[in-house]
Amino acid sequence: MRSVIKNINDMANLYPNREAYIGINEKVTYKELNEKISKMLIFLSKIENNIDQICTICQKESNAVAILLATSLLNIDNSIIPYDAHQYTKIEDVEFTNDVIVISEEDFDKNTTILTDVSNHFINSPIEKNNIKDIVEKESLKDIQLFFEKSCSPAKLILYTSGTTGKSKGVIVSYNQFNFINVPITEQNEGINIITKGSSVRPFLGTILSTLKEGKTILQIDVDNCFDMTNLCERADIESLTTNIYGIKKFISIAKKNKHLYNRIPLVTITGGVMHQFLREKSVEVFPNAKLLDLYGQTELGLISVIDSTEWCENEYCVGTPSFFVDVTIKDLHSHMELKEREIGHITVKSNHKFKGYSNHTAIALDEVYTGDLGYLKDSKLYLFGRISDCLKYGDSWLLKRDIECKLSEGFSEKFQVLVRDGRFYIILERHSSRIEKIIEDKFSSFKQLIQIKIVQEINETN
């Protein structure tokens, strides 16, 4: 076992009654978690190379622990546990956001039904119950793709829905998640490793791994159909194909190729959705020693974040899903040097194909789909800044303009404005407030000398 399990073992000895979130609805003490792991390891000692068998055994105890063990067995130190709202188990009528349902022949014969969205509308699309057999035989739902995986025994159908993320519901009637890893894509087995059709921005802006070394890139792939995938595989050296379930399959497939490469790799996430924020925070509790880096930013095309489709407006222009690939480089665009800790540089994501936006918007991807100034903070989190002028450095620490704005908004109800000028933050008020001074003292004491309060007659854009 590697360091993730060792960390939990250490925590069990130090804080046996401390509770750890291993899923949104799954909370145990470190002592209980350690006991679960110890129990499972007895079964895993002889089968550690069979990921599917590992997870099948582990899921009987705990979905999240199953993932923890699967990643730990493969020597991935910076694992992150996905929330268990939908994955890996025989759960009926649950929300799912990975838009994949695996159906066995037995389920097919029993006329199993599923709940899925049936329209091409990404906003407020209807949810209906449909019989799987009818879908296969009549092809009555054109918005649903079915692929037959011929290499499995017994054979299984893999159902990919159009995927209104955060809204679709389905029945996961059979566990088969890790069978699709690192299988070559051919015309004969086109159902294997096919990525969900029309899913949300999550595959593009969701979990991304990066070595942060020598500008190495890792492909995050999301395609619409087998034709695109065939072209992609002919044109690029694909390290792995993954669904949009927080990169778990990417963790495993890449780590299997080079176990030593990912010993020191931070997990980079571009987050914004509530669930991702929850996941990030709770993963720190579960893995206190894990190094999690978070990217935040904004682009001309829309927010760099994961936003449920129900939150979008008709006139909102979102990036959508890349049809081919995006590569992520963590290095300065000007010097072309990799970023060191506490350095500021540029990050870019590039694509060679179209990006499909929601509400029928389409656009050719820019050479630089988004760019932003990048920097490390003292808490080991990586931030993507909209502009370099929006943050200031003092000593080894960085302070963002929006950090001040957020804290002031929480504790101050009157109108204010935060500006960055000449190496200082200026808080603009229309009248003096002792409350502002207290917030600065409590929240930004180490930056006090960089923060000044200015009183004006009226707050406006010309301040």
Sequence positions of predicted segments:
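Conserved pre-ATP/AMP-binding loop-to-beta segment of ANL
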Residues: P16-E19, N120, S125-N130, D134-Y160, ...
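Conserved AMP-binding/adenylate-forming core of the ANL superfamily
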Residues: N17-E48, C55, Q59-E61, Q87-K90, ...
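Conserved AMP-binding A3 loop
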Residues: T29-Y30, F147-E149, K156-V183
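Conserved AMP-binding/adenylate-forming
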Residues: F43-A85, I195-G198, W398, I453
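AMP-binding/adenylate-forming catalytic core of the ANL superfamily
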Residues: T56, S351, D367, G372-N463
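Gly/Ser/Thr-rich phosphate-binding loop
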Residues: E239-L241, I254-N315
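Conserved ATP/PPi-binding loop(s) of AMP-dependent carboxylate-activating enzymes
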Residues: T321-F325, S335-D367, K381, R387, ...
